[in-house]
Amino acid sequence: NMPSLLYAAKSARAPYMLPAGPEAIDLSHQLLTIPVGTSATITFSATLDDTRYSSGSEPVQNIAAAEFYIDTPPWITATTPLPIAMTPADGNFDSSVEVVNGSLDASGLALGRHSVFIRGQDAAGNWGIVAAFFVDVVETESLYLPLVTHP
């Protein structure tokens, strides 16, 4: 089953720690390709779920925090990754499954591909499985906008 295989691959870095925290799933995002220098805000959301794959053997806690990182994942310690807080869609971190929202000012992003890493933490302090997506910053003339016509 594909979801279990993806979960195993994403948790392989710390297989006895990461599954204790919430998994970031169901990413939704806008503006994945933007011209360099554009003053645009990239908005995105994710669901943080502390109930997945527990089968009753793993305790379930409320989500306590959510954050994202640009270009450097949180487990890289050679540099200091900068966490940026995300907010709960309903205004409160008060359940074991939460939709969280984030926004990123794209005006400072350099030309090229950038990674955005999202993770959540439960009330017991466990950080969970990270999810990620790409944002491409391109030269203005190389921005491809498809033309759709109907016969």
Predicted regions and their residues:
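N-terminal pro-sequences and low-complexity stem/linker regions of secreted or lumenal proteins
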Residues: 1-3
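Proline/serine/threonine-rich low-complexity linkers at boundaries of modular beta-sandwich domains
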Residues: 5-27
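Long, low-complexity serine/threonine/glycine- and acidic-rich segments characteristic of extracellular
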Residues: 19-139
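Conserved functional hotspot residues at active sites or interaction interfaces
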Residues: 146
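Short, solvent-exposed mixed-charge patches
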Residues: 150-151
